[in-house]
Amino acid sequence: MTTIKQFLCGATVAGMVAATGAAVGAPAGLSAVTADWLLAAEHVLLIGLDGVNLSKVLEYAYDDDSGFKTAMDQGITGAASLTNHTTLSGPSWSTILTGVWDDKHGVFNNLFRPEPYNQWPTVFNLIEYNKPEVDTTIISNWEYLNQLAGAGGYSVDNNIFVPAGDSPADSDALVTALTIAQILGTEDNPDDISSFLFSYQSQADHAGHSFAGGSEEYMQSIINLGANIQQILAAIAHVQSITGDDWSIILTTDHGHQQTVTLPGLSIGHGFQSPNETSSFVIFDQAGDDANDGSQSLGYSTVDITPTILSLFGIPLRSDFDGVSLVNDPAVLDGIVEPTDLKQSLLDALAMYGYPNIGNDITLAIRTVIGSVPYFLDKFVTEIDTFLQSIVDQDIFLISGLAEVAQQINEFFGGLTVNVTNTVAHGFAYLLGSGVIAPTDAPLPLPGAAEFTGSLESLLAGDTFTAPDIGDLDLSLLLDVDALLG
């Protein structure tokens, strides 16, 4: 038995080879006279690290025991900046995972709304629609990202949410273990199924909010993350030694952190436009590119990540992307340099970033403040609900019943208040430039709207069927090779 994903991939590739003897649609920059690049598994890993200042990585984790340095030594590192864009996690991860800035996708705070991702499909949607044979996975301990990966008509195959646990560090350790298990699972891959894996860790952001980016706690979180990354990279090296499969690896963050506490035990952390908050980075290790190991990019941006992932799978890019592919964009490739001292060169690059003009600075600050009101209201309502639930769970005569009634009242009126304030905040955010640019590309068709009469979603989810022998198929009926060749 085989899955519909495996069959679609095999039939299409076989048809291309049989009819042309060449790889149709090979990615730019790759010369191929066979379809070997299509038949071999291609794996892409995106490691998301919330709230990590590159300057602190270079200070605390630039050593041979850290996965940060290993990744830098094996790839290309770019110091990036989010200047003129909101430095909140929801908007920033949306940019990373859609390839457009917040003036397009319209995400303005950390309360999940599915609507932006219907207009601006995520990397998961675009992979699942264009190449459903690719196995897509998210492993995350922030539920917003799991919701994002499940949004749109073509959601992620494997959506793994990791609970908070006893501490953010413990939760990240579990994310690391699950990520390694997912990687090791590709060792037994007889059907050469390609994969995209997004692994997200959050402890640095928690440390930054509680103790600020200049604290010992933040330092320890960076060291911990370096150790986690090292384990993940070791797992990839192990699998590669057995399978020979190609792995491309990207590391990034959504924003930086303020360096001092706002109040004892509390730091605003980020959301505004100081250089420490707008600090970001991209580390890119492309499979097969050993010539640029240890290099620096002067042009990497977080908005380039989704276009890059798509191009690695040979998927065409949207014309309304703000980002470009780091694989083959001429300007990006021209911006790769080989510094004599990578650490110092990256610090010099970070020092060049400053504040936006005063108008943008004020506008973005107002947008952050307004967008934060419904977010913190939601947290307050949730905390009340959790407290009342603890009383309900004790099953105390009369009191637990009253707590349950109070819980229902809190959920109704609290939820209504959050929804109303979030709608108002959304309107203000739009007036301040969030989501004002509409897509120019056509939306993705609804699942099941064309080729299949059944539920395409259920087929892509892994339902099995008896596949005919490819040698018995009339492949000319499956695809028009002349049309593909233009």
Regions found by a protein language model. Give the residues of each.
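Short, structured active-site-proximal loop/turn typified by the sulfatase FGly-forming signature C/S-X-P-X-R
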Residues: 55-91, 100
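Composition-driven, intrinsically disordered low-complexity tracts enriched in small residues
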Residues: 1-42, 334-486
